[in-house]
Amino acid sequence: MLAGAGRPGLPQGRHLCWLLCAFTLKLCQAEAPVQEEKLSASTSNLPCWLVEEFVVAEECSPCSNFRAKTTPECGPTGYVEKITCSSSKRNEFKSCRSALMEQRLFWKFEGAVVCVALIFACLVIIRQRQLDRKALEKVRKQIESI
């Protein structure tokens, strides 16, 4: 018998569990980093940092409004670093993940985990109270029958 089946007002245990799992999965997918587009096989279209050594000229920083509109590398994360390729001496921009962004994502994840833990702790407490009431009712009926 399903948890809560046959009793009005109690949520179906499995349905609630699936709902929470789906919510958590959706939350994790929303926070997942965006994968870069698949690049073509020709090396002429590849950024120089994929095929040769490079040096970071400017550290990872947030894109300005203008740069976000004009530089496609700002799209995936909103942060970009300027690099200089060693052999070709080309200056290019590369999308990057900043420590601030990673910290923000970490705390969002931690908050979601704490919320899910609190929800399940409440469910455990509610179920324990139901079982205690059932046990007390059985004991009461046994005492009355004596």
Curated annotation (Swiss-Prot):
Extracellular membrane side: 31-105
A cellular-component GO term for this protein: cytoplasm
Superkingdom, natural source: Eukaryota
Segments in the Cytoplasmic topological domain: 127-146
Induction: Protein levels increase during the S phase of the cell cycle, are highest during G2 and mitosis, and decrease to low levels at G1. Levels are lowest at the transition from G1 to S phase.
Pfam families with a match to the protein in the record: JTB (PF05439)
Keywords carried by this UniProt record: Apoptosis, Cell cycle, Cell division, Cytoplasm, Cytoskeleton, Membrane, Mitochondrion, Mitosis, Signal, Transmembrane, Transmembrane helix
Bilayer disposition of the protein: Single-pass type I membrane protein
Protein's recorded name: Protein JTB
Organism of provenance: Homo sapiens (Human)
